[in-house]
From Swiss-Prot:
Domain PPIase FKBP-type residue range list: 166-251
Comment block on domains: Consists of 3 domains; the N-terminus binds the ribosome, the middle domain has PPIase activity, while the C-terminus has intrinsic chaperone activity on its own.
Free-text function comment from the UniProt entry: Involved in protein export. Acts as a chaperone by maintaining the newly synthesized protein in an open conformation. Functions as a peptidyl-prolyl cis-trans isomerase.
Protein's name according to its UniProt entry: Trigger factor
Native source species: Cereibacter sphaeroides (strain ATCC 17025 / ATH 2.4.3)
Known catalytic reactions: [protein]-peptidylproline (omega=180) = [protein]-peptidylproline (omega=0)
Protein encoded by which gene: tig
Pfam families from the UniProt entry: FKBP_C (PF00254), Trigger_C (PF05698), Trigger_N (PF05697)
Disulphides: none
Family of the protein in this entry: Belongs to the FKBP-type PPIase family. Tig subfamily.
Length: 444
């Protein structure tokens, strides 16, 4: 077996692997000897079938396996000897594959880009500022007010009052398309908060100003992406009878409100709110700190990037942003989306930082534990109520999804590792300043 280098230019590598006919024949023989003890054939005891007969019957079938094993072994030996780590799966092509005949040498061309040598960084030279926000009394009171509004009751307005935005009306309604009632389009004594956006766009607005006993015909058009395909894009009429108009009445901020939310009393609820707010502030602060760290790391290192990785990342960015700008397009029935220079620059940054963090994690032997993966899968499974088991099975069978869940956990652990060695000072700020810092992340 011979491996000949044909290209070594920057990170690009190309090799010709030659497996001689004799080596391939020996591999086939090896597989036949390995299988012989388990083979039964008429006229022979188990394990006693002559190799010549086995070769005649199974040789052609084993030839492909032997060829693949030989090539895989040559590639594995080469990578171990050279120390190369391919950035992506190597491209492998058999020379004269369509005309190759048994008894001749197998020649394979292998191409790949090697991962670059990544310089070490001195984490002690990383200087960062962590924003710290305390949950003050005003923030807790604001959160309490929001909870009270969420727990609000509705009291009947005086007779003859017109419904306002934010009021709750109780209605009977019957929906029809082209004069025909449709399934699921009718209800009685339905409580609807005007302005809540819980009905089809345009429905609630037409009931503002209605009074008890009013008969209102609401005309709307179902959205084109509506879930019920037979109604999507159709014009509909709803015959509505208003049976009650009620004004919102916020719940009192007291121990009773606290008990509604599972707290022992108001003081305990305030403590829970403060704890939740500070956890939210801490999470937002970490996002700002992480971006600052990545920005700094990006200026500290410079190395050649595998062009194929950058190209793949740029196309993924372009594709993702295109779909964000065209949310109505759910499939892939669109033309090729060519990355812009901005996409390519962002791709280079992501690949550079990704390789740097991966190398730091590799050298520090950072791993993602089974428990951490389980937590990540559980968190995702909660987004599919009633289908959690199916989601678990889907993840188990899909290594790509497993990697998508593992990658951010690994990255965060490496970030924590770098922060441990960095100089990080704390700066106490208000929540508005933190909010501005978070908004600035989206603008970058």
């Amino acid at each position: 077996m011979q491996v000949t280098e044909t290209l070594k230019e920057g990170l690009k590598r190309a090799y010709t692997i030659t497996v001689t006919a004799a080596e391939l024949d020996a591999k086939v023989q090896e597989k036949l000897v390995e299988a012989q003890p388990d083979i039964e054939m008429k006229g022979f005891r188990k394990g006693k079938v002559p190799l010549a007969m086995l070769r005649k019957q199974f040789g052609p079938r084993l030839l492909g396996d032997a060829m693949q094993d030989a090539i895989d072994g040559a590639m594995r030996d080469h990578l171990e000897t050279s120390g190369d780590r391919p950035a992506m799966q190597p491209e492998v092509r058999m020379v004269d594959g369509e005309t190759w005949q048994e008894g001749t040498d197998v020649v394979v061309e292998m191409k790949y880009e090697a991962l670059p040598e990544i310089p070490e960084i001195e984490t002690s030279k990383v200087t960062l500022e962590r924003l710290v926000v305390k949950a003050d009394e005003a923030a807790v009171d604001e959160a309490l007010k929001n909870l009270a509004e969420s727990a609000q009751n509705f009291d009947d307005r005086r007779k003859g009052s017109k419904a306002k935005d934010g009021d709750q009306i109780v209605i009977d309604f019957k929906g029809s398309v082209d004069g025909e009632l449709f399934e699921g389009g009718s209800a009685e004594d339905y409580p609807l908060v005007l302005g809540s956006g819980s009905f089809i766009p345009g429905f609630e607005e037409q009931l503002v100003g209605a009074k008890v006993e009013d008969e209102v015909t609401v005309k709307v058009t179902f959205p084109t992406e509506y879930g019920a395909k037979h109604l999507a894009g159709k014009e509909a009429e709803f015959a509505c009878t208003v049976k009650a108009v009620k004004a919102p009445k916020p719940a009192e901020i007291d121990d009773e409100l606290a008990k509604k939310y599972g707290a022992e009393d108001l003081a305990a609820l305030k403590a829970q709110i403060a704890e939740r707010l500070e956890a939210e502030y801490k999470g937002a602060s970490r996002a700002v700190l992480k971006r600052a760290l990545l920005d700094q790391l990006d200026t500290m290192v410079s190395f050649e990037l595998p062009s194929k990785l950058v190209e793949a990342e740029a196309h993924q960015i372009a594709h993702q942003l295109w779909h964000e700008e065209h949310p109505e397009e759910h499939g892939h029935n669109h033309g090729t989306i060519e990355p812009t220079d901005e996409h390519k620059a962002l791709a280079e940054r992501r690949v550079r930082l990704g390789l740097l963090l991966a190398e730091i994690g590799r050298k520090a032997e950072v791993t993602v534990t089974d428990a951490e993966m389980t937590q990540a899968v559980l968190a995702q499974a909660r987004q599919y109520p009633g289908q959690e088991r199916a989601y678990f099975e889907f993840v188990q069978k899909n290594p790509q999804i497993q990697q998508q869940l593992r990658a951010p956990i690994f990255e965060d652990k490496v970030v924590d590792l770098i922060l441990e060695g960095a100089t990080v000072t704390e700066k106490e700020v208000g929540k508005d300043d933190l909010q501005k810092a978070i908004e600035a992340l989206d603008e970058m």
